[in-house]
Amino acid sequence: MDGNRRYAKKNSVECTVGHYKGFDKLSECLKWCLDLGIPQVTVYAFSIENFKRSKKEVDALTELAKEKFQRLLDEIDQINEWGVRLNVAGRLCLFPHDLQVLISKVMLATKHNNKLQLNIAYAYTGRDEISRAASHIVDGLKQKEISPDDVNEHLMSQALDLGEPDLLVRTSGEVRLSDFMLWQISNTVLYFTNVLWPEFSIWNLLAAIIHFQRHSPPIIEEKENSPVIEKFLKKLEDTKWQQLEKIVAC
C-alpha cells in the first residue's frame, strides 16, 4: 500500500489525509478480492522502520489504526457474515496497549472465518519475521520438541507469520521489496505499477492478475509434515492465540 504520502503531496493535503485514503482503498480492494474469489490478501501497512518517521506522523498513524480497528469491532457481525479472517503479523508489543487490545479482539473474533484471510503486516519487516521464526525453532530444539534433523527450509517457512504469496503487487513506482516477505517470495510473480495506492482501481487489480496468469510458475506440491512437526507447529499456533487472549484480559 505505497504512495499515500505522495498522494497527499500531489493533492496538497496533509499526510494524514493520504493515509486515510489508503485505508479506504484497502476496504474497497478487499471487496473486489471477495468478488473475485481470492482466498488470501496480505498488505504491508506499517514497517518497523516507519517508527523512524516524525513523532507527529507515527502518532497520527497509530490513531488511525485505533479508529479503523475499532470500526472493525463495531462491524464484526458484517465481517463474520462475509467470512473474512483478520491476521496481524509483526511485533504488536511495539504499539500502545490499547491498540494491541483492539487488534487482539478483532483477530480472536474472526479466527474461525475461512472465505478470505486478510493478513496485515504491522510493525513488521521480513528480516524481523525470519529472526522470530528462527528463535521459535531454537526454542523447540532446546525443549526437545524437535530434533536437528527436523530443521530445514520447509520448517522455517511454516514457522513464519506469513505464507508464500502467488503474486506481489507494489504500487507508486517503487521497484524495491522494502524488507517485505523476503523468505517467502522465491517463487512469487512480481508486479510493479506507477499508480499511487489511493488511486488503485479494479482495472489495476485485473491488470496485475492478468500479469500473474501470463507468468505464473508451475504449482509446487506441498510436502507432508511428520507428526512431530505438526505437534510443534500446533504449539506455536496455540501460543499465539493464548498471547492474544492474555492481551485482551489485561
Locate predicted features.
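Flexible, compositionally biased loop and terminal segments
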Residues: M1-C250
